[in-house]
């Protein structure tokens, strides 16, 4: 895992000690406590020597629907997921969350950060499904902040005048193929590219770092 050698450009100094982790989930409905999680992907970020945010590591898991949770046909029609397809190579929810948390903890330690923070497009949705899965899995230590997030829908609305992921990416000059949309891995990658573009654009415009006399 790469870390900038320039102390001024350490990731921990950019987001008040938070370690940003891009997340996307695909689900069997909109209720994080009643509807099943079907797919989850994360992308960790790093900062290069020039202080620009870059994509680092990726993790993606297809999830076996947790017994007792709803699987709504309307959701499956939308995301085109067959939750019982054996070729999905799906794993149970708890195992996936533990693998993700192990990767995130290593990143937090490597980057000398204090806590991970979810970065997502319409972040409340992804954050709530993640937290619900953690509760069901009875995992004691959660490296993610319990409520703070970075929402790229809000950020892109401010910076680009668009809140839909595909439209925001196109305006930002990021290629987006709708044929691959609603895959957790693809959407997380595009969300990561969008977040990096917005953060880096702000830096290029002189918005970061903040002048010492304003700190």
Swiss-Prot record:
Q: What class of enzyme is it?
A: hydrolase
Which Gene3D superfamilies does the record associate with it? Ribonuclease H-like superfamily/Ribonuclease H
Q: Which cofactor does it need?
A: Mg(2+)
Q: Does the keyword Nuclease apply?
A: yes
Q: Where is the active site?
A: 182 (proton donor/acceptor)
> Which Gene Ontology cellular component annotation is one that this UniProt entry carries?
cytosol
Chain ranges of the Exonuclease domain: 21-195
Family per similarity comment: Belongs to the RNase T family.
**Listed NCBIfam families:** RNaseT
Subunit and interaction comment:
Homodimer.
* Protein name, per record: Ribonuclease T
């Amino acid at each position: 895992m790469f870390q900038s050698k320039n102390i001024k450009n350490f990731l921990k100094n950019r987001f008040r000690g938070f370690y940003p982790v891009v997340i996307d989930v695909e689900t069997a409905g909109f209720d994080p406590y009643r509807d099943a999680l079907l797919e989850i992907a994360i992308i960790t970020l790093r900062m290069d020597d020039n202080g620009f945010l870059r994509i680092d590591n990726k993790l993606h898991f297809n999830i076996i629907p947790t017994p007792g949770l709803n699987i709504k046909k309307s959701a499956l029609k939308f995301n085109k997921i067959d939750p019982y397809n054996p070729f999905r190579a799906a794993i149970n929810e708890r195992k996936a969350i533990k693998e993700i948390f192990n990767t995130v903890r290593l990143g937090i330690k490597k980057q000398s950060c204090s806590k991970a923070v979810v970065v997502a497009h319409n972040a409340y949705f992804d954050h709530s499904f993640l937290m619900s899965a953690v509760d069901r899995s009875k995992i004691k230590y959660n490296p993610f902040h319990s409520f703070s997030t970075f929402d790229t829908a809000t950020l892109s609305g401010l910076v680009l005048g668009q809140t839909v992921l595909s439209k925001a990416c196109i305006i930002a000059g990021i290629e987006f193929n709708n044929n691959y949309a609603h895959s957790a891995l693809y959407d997380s990658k595009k969300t990561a590219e969008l977040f990096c573009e917005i953060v880096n654009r702000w830096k290029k415009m002189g918005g970061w770092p903040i002048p010492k006399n304003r700190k």
